[in-house]
């Protein structure tokens, strides 16, 4: 699951992204609870902060940028007669008027790129847009002249991991789609680019780029010679409020002149301040401007206040053989194609047992290797005559590791996974001893799993682990020159056999020693 230079960490095999229809668990529905209920736990603040930051709750606004000009030609092609003098065309004006009447829709249409931003106050400084290489609008927005360059770039991006793509130290890259969008706050035409520093998994997979106030956008704009416009001055917010009030009294914009820096800044400013180059909002402090611009966007049907999370829904399927099969069947039509309807195995058909197979290697296609399982396991006919095909994805190891502590309390129960009286007697876990490296994976997933079981009435508490203690981490030999050392791990081949210590001092002594390092 680690990718280095487009190859797997183990074996150095080429890794490529494929679009797959997979199973997801909607952990985002529990995001607020996963944050708020941390306060009641006897865990270190550092671990709590790691989970809070991983979930990454933020407030901001969703904003729609119009791109619905005349696909498949350039959405705003000045040479095709699709744009009037002044940079706008009837379709945009009609769209804007329609939005003013209907309001901001819950889901964006095919004529807009929707973005999420924590800084709607910087909207006047958006000089270009970026969509992720996987965005559904890539084909729609790519002009014939740019198709070859876009196809090449998208292919290259598919070989990179998300970590590589978002590494701040790496050079930014991108490709112009040939198309433009309209900035809804000032009506200006701005180009739409594709760049892999934008991830499809965060927000909407599209951003409004404000290079004067974002480091990544700045680097990209400088590289591709895109305009950079300052819209936030680092002037004192209270000073800005006073000057704005003075300007109102005098009726002159000159009072604000010393707040406005050059439209072409020499460095990035990402903090709070007062608005500049923002029309009637000049001099407005950042927090006040955020609220005002959001209200104005909502009134015009162009945007809305929104909450977003860095946390994504949990990908819960794998294409390998070894894993718990999903107890799900897909209905097939007369031609053997899926209809979209599904059925589940009955209780007396559980658990689903993996078929015996001689070959376990991947198929070389996006299809799970269980798609080559014997037909007797793969297909069946329902009592009503409907032909069914078994789901061939398998569950990840998390399917077992998220709730093992519950089964420990009642391991021999063949009637249910955990007797209610036993659960009330033994749980929640009083003390969990585990490494800090589990903070945003196992510990977060187990909390989510437990909350789902709590909501379903299977456990009596909403949290699984009351107290958490992190033991030390064993390191391998350090480099004598740099002092750097990797953790001791089987995958790194730097382990020491503990048998000698166990023979001399006993296993419990070794365990306690490790716990209190």
Predicted regions and their residues:
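Residue patterns forming the tRNA-binding/recognition surfaces of aminoacyl-tRNA synthetases
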Residues: 1-68, 95, 99, 104-107, ...
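Conserved catalytic micro-motifs used in adenylation/nucleotidyl-transfer and phosphoryl/amide-
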Residues: 7, 62-65, 111-122, 180-184, ...
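Conserved active-site neighborhood of enzyme catalytic/cofactor-binding cores
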Residues: 7-8, 179, 202-233, 317-517
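Amphipathic alpha-helical
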Residues: 24-58, 132-176, 350-378
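Short, low-complexity, charge-dense intrinsically disordered segments
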Residues: 74, 79, 238-253, 257-263
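Structured, non-catalytic alpha/beta "coupling" segments that mediate domain-domain communication
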Residues: 120-140, 321-331, 335, 341
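Catalytic alpha/beta core of large soluble enzyme barrels
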Residues: 135-234, 267
